[in-house]
């Protein structure tokens, strides 16, 4: 049995986690055509909640119809979607675990057909396409920006007060709408929403303030991916000062946690970027401090996760490790890591099959876990 600091308890929002292994938010296209979570989703999250005291973060969830930028992604508006999510939440809570919903708006990164089929258009911080040859979005006007802020707030209320989520994670990463305002590679505005570090930060910070006011500071997290070049991001000259300012403001709001993602594909495209002193987010981790949890994602496996918490950040108890692909194929992942049990391999071909349980809820638990099935849940 492992004695790694991965398996020490940590305060998190209004709860206490039994370990530091977190389910990553992952888009899997398992909602129906209207964005209502299918029953597969309840099974998926319940399986991964089976080790008591686990933290789960959901798929990216559209906050309103115009932010649903892809088919078969879930939403959190209207009573039918809220009710379906409540079933998921109740099942997770019955296992003794915790679940936070990720609030999402796609902006220029949306699938154009998914919008135009509903009479909607691409919108972003500026008229800058996600890549050369891709459709050019409209620059959102002042009224639209204010409405987006309200939509995030309502989405948070629907999640926490309606569906019973333990909190919400605001998706500010991976080139989606908040990132499109935050980074000058996309944001070319000259009004109060662009043109300076402070102005580019304004959209994400106003959203965060509104959500904090709506559901409480200890129910709000933020995900960022400073170094990701996915969807046209990560190429600005003042990247470190931009994110230093943004993270400082988040810290002052006393939100529950910060989630930082490193990008494996950035390293594959440009291995030299690894030599930048801030590439692995150490500067931002230090800025965040030791008071509140910080989630770190970036292709971790069991060995690198242990090194992260036991060596790199051995001086702090607030670093949690986010797993995606390995959690897909190992619903009992925390148990396997603690007991030193080999991981099952994942199948990429089944990651994104719409409306299907294949490769989603059909990975088995290990025999050692099942031998304890008479317990309500396995202690983390």
Swiss-Prot record:
It comes from the Eukaryota. One of its GO terms (molecular function) is NADPH dehydrogenase activity. FMN binds at residues 25-27, 60, 102, 171, 223, 299, 324-325. Pfam families: Oxidored_FMN (PF00724). Substrate binds at residues 171, 174, 352. Changing residue 81 to Q: In strain: P1 / 1029/N5. Keywords: Flavoprotein, FMN. Probable inactive dehydrogenase; part of the gene cluster that mediates the biosynthesis of fungal ergot alkaloid. DmaW catalyzes the first step of ergot alkaloid biosynthesis by condensing dimethylallyl diphosphate (DMAP) and tryptophan to form 4-dimethylallyl-L-tryptophan. The second step is catalyzed by the methyltransferase easF that methylates 4-dimethylallyl-L-tryptophan in the presence of S-adenosyl-L-methionine, resulting in the formation of 4-dimethylallyl-L-abrine. Belongs to the NADH:flavin oxidoreductase/NADH oxidase family. This is Probable inactive dehydrogenase easA. The lineage of its organism: Eukaryota, Fungi, Dikarya, Ascomycota, Pezizomycotina. The gene is easA.
